[in-house]
């Protein structure tokens, strides 16, 4: 009977040693995994924008993004004719419009125009949408705003260290030209401002008149995302509006 008790006691102690041994191995592994996860969640969001911005400087040696978008831009020459229609506007005045069915509206990610500011040495492909591919190859219209000629706010984004670096030289009175396949539009810069990235009063997407707003990260020599944005505001000077009604 004593022998049985001793044997049982040995089994119990052996069992405790096995459990302690497993705990000694498993607990440090779990602790390391938790520590890694916490550090990852804490630091990756901070470094990602910087890494992405630094990558912009080496983009020539990276993947070719030029084949990842559709180009529907066919410049309108001086001798070409864009189909138009004459109608009365809200004031009863005769006005010429670009026929709606002659406009090839861009899909998200399409290159559909060119944005030029001669005084700022800005000449960039204009995309509909402001995703990474668009901003690596030009500047992009926020998809929640409007295309030129549609009579609303055109909100255009570009990187401060590439295509929109020249905005630092923007001044009141300078002209901005946007070329599309259905017409060319001229805007005049009316104001510039530095505002917080979270300031929703910096733009009005519900405006019932055509206006152009261009923006980029600020300061211009900063890498990655910043807490400020540099805005350039412009009014429409010339260009045939699009007839919003189907023809």
Please report, for each region that a protein language model flagged, where it lies by residue.
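Conserved small/polar residues in nucleotide/adenosyl-binding loops
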Residues: 1-4
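Solvent-exposed, non-transmembrane regions of membrane-associated and secreted proteins
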Residues: 8, 15-247
């Amino acid at each position: 009977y004593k022998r049985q008790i001793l044997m049982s006691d040995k089994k119990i102690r052996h069992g405790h040693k096995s459990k302690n041994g497993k705990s000694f191995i498993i607990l440090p592994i779990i602790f390391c995994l938790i520590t890694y996860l916490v550090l990852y969640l804490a630091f990756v969001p901070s470094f990602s924008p910087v890494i992405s911005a630094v990558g912009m400087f080496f983009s020539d040696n990276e993947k070719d993004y030029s084949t990842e978008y559709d180009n529907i831009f066919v410049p309108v020459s001086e001798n070409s004719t864009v189909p138009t229609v004459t109608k009365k506007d809200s004031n009863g005045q005769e006005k010429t419009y670009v026929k709606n069915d002659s406009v090839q509206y861009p899909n998200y990610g399409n290159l559909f125009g060119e944005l030029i500011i001669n005084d700022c040495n800005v000449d960039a492909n204009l995309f509909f949408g402001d995703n990474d591919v668009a901003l690596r190859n030009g500047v992009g219209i926020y998809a929640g705003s409007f295309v030129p000629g549609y009579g609303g706010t055109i909100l255009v984004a570009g990187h401060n260290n590439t295509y929109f670096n020249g905005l630092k030289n923007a001044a009141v009175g300078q002209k901005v030209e946007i070329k599309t396949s259905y017409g060319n539009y001229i805007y005049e810069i009316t104001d510039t401002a530095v505002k917080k990235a979270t300031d929703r009063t910096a733009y009005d997407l519900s405006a019932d008149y055509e206006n152009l707003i261009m923006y980029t990260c600020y300061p211009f020599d900063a890498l990655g995302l910043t807490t400020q944005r540099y805005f350039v505001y412009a009014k429409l000077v010339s260009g045939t509006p699009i007839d919003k009604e189907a023809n």
